Amino acid sequence: MAGCCCLSAEEKESQRISAEIERQLRRDKKDARRELKLLLLGTGESGKSTFIKQMRIIHGSGYSDEDRKGFTKLVYQNIFTAMQAMIRAMDTLKIQYVCEQNKENAQLIREVEVDKVSTLSRDQVEAIKQLWQDPGIQECYDRRREYQLSDSAKYYLTDIDRIAMPAFVPTQQDVLRVRVPTTGIIEYPFDLENIIFRMVDVGGQRSERRKWIHCFESVTSIIFLVALSEYDQVLAECDNENRMEESKALFKTIITYPWFLNSSVILFLNKKDLLEEKIMYSHLISYFPEYTGPKQDVKAARDFILKLYQDQNPDKEKVIYSHFTCATDTENIRFVFAAVKDTILQLNLREFNLV
């Protein structure tokens, strides 16, 4: 104790700084314990970015008029991307236009440089409307599993009159439906009951997955999204590989990573609305011969796909929490995420000094 009296002013200042650093480190450690890191994983187009948008709507500031205006150009571009995909598929699938005029309309739309689109001209709108009404294009749309077409194509094309209005401002649903492939890593933090939920969305395409490694530290939970409707579709990157087989293989890889041994796993079986439509005409057994349930049975199909993923889990002690979702339905996601939040908090009670 006597030695302390002999400390120089410089040494006292050094001790004070050391003590302050120690206090700050303790505070940081406590703060870190009050932050949950949720890693959103899944193959491309499984609905991860839409889920993040829903978190912003439900638990964040939502989308103001100004925010939504910022999506106008993307809505237009999504429409051209969809129509161009169908025009190309008309050639590939050798489907004829019923209306002769639509050959010219198709040429007009084909020449559009999508990434430069910022407006819709009257000629373009008329061409798109006539094409969409053509029975040939409708047949092509019905065969969309044979090529790559965004899930939002029908939503936008059937609403082209509203979207073409001069004063058009995208609605919340328009924003949720916009498709922009995620490149890189997007973080979205939001505060719930004094705990920060930090949601991390990473690109689902194969080329993006090598970037995931940086996200693997201290992950509380993995939310893995599966597109239920992709059982009969092929990959954008490889046209002879089934999308669901790829998703299933990725899920197995993720849940057996050593980094995630202590992370809870939540499975979102997404796009349940699209499965309900598709199962009526595209039979599961044609793509998964091991399916023994009845045709056109939504519940049997959902249960079969859930079991496909549960069977990838080698650790039978590890619980996989599952939910059937529709990421474009705000009320469905509000309900599901409330259950997910409770599950995550229950699993982390001690960590967060909640007991």
From Swiss-Prot:
G1 motif as annotated region, ranges: 37-50
Spans annotated as G3 motif: 197-206
Keyword entries, A-Z: GTP-binding, Magnesium, Metal-binding, Nucleotide-binding, Transducer
A single BP term in Gene Ontology: adenylate cyclase-modulating G protein-coupled receptor signaling pathway
GO cellular component terms listed in the entry, alphabetical order: cytoplasm; heterotrimeric G-protein complex; plasma membrane
GO molecular function, one term: G protein-coupled receptor binding
Stretch list, region G2 motif: 174-182
Annotated segments matching region G5 motif: 325-330
Binding-site residues for GTP, renumbered to this chain: 42-49, 176-182, 201-205, 270-273, 327
Positions that bind Mg(2+): 49, 182
InterPro entries on file: Gprotein_alpha_Q, Gprotein_alpha_su, GproteinA_insert, P-loop_NTPase
Recorded superkingdom: Eukaryota
Residue ranges of every copy of the G-alpha domain listed in the record: 34-355
Annotated region (G4 motif), positions in chain: 266-273
Annotated function: Guanine nucleotide-binding proteins (G proteins) are involved as modulators or transducers in various transmembrane signaling systems.
Protein family according to the UniProt entry: Belongs to the G-alpha family. G(q) subfamily.
Quaternary state and interactors: G proteins are composed of 3 units; alpha, beta and gamma. The alpha chain contains the guanine nucleotide binding site.
The protein's name: Guanine nucleotide-binding protein subunit alpha-14
